[in-house]
Amino acid sequence: MAKLVIEVPEEFTEVGKAMAEHLAALQRTVSRLGGGKAVDYAEIEQAMSESAGRTELAGHRAILQSLDIDVPAVIIGGLRYTRVGRCEAPFHTMVGSVSVERSLYRQSGERGGQPGGRVVDPVSLRAGVVEDGWLPRVARAMAHAVQQGPSREAEASAREFGRLRSEERRVGERV
């Protein structure tokens, strides 16, 4: 067996673990296919897609976390915003949702409930998030699917293609 050693930066540890799990799943799959028998390749495709999806989700989490800005104040559109807290929020991708901790900011001098008192999230602003955590590609894909027919048909298509996990399929109703 060939030995391959890769260095994984600390912020990508979860990505490295997901990659190792994906490789282990691949090895288990190949090891049980001997003997010349027919296989249910649709089942193999599904399993490989789910395993690769976990690696993709870990990558999205690392990238989105890197977009966080954790400082006392930021300037957005020429206006000063003050940090009001940090909390986790879900971000929805083509393969599922990831939770990312990020800072929240409010325009300096404003309070909640006032026109300028809306809380902003730099991760969402920097990533071009649509609505409540929908990353651009998943939002665009569902908007496209929904414009071709009812949202239930878009949901069925997404399920058949194996992309857009259950909670993400509902974005079509909101995009």
Language model: regions and residue ranges:
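Generic hydrophobic-segment detector
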Residues: 68, 85-86, 144, 148
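Hydrophobic alpha-helical segments, chiefly the membrane-spanning helices
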Residues: 173-175
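N-terminal juxtadomain amphipathic helix
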Residues: 73-101
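Short, positively charged, Gly/Tyr-enriched micro-motifs
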Residues: 2-14, 18-39, 98-170
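Electropositive nucleic-acid engagement tracts
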Residues: 43, 47-79, 130, 149-170
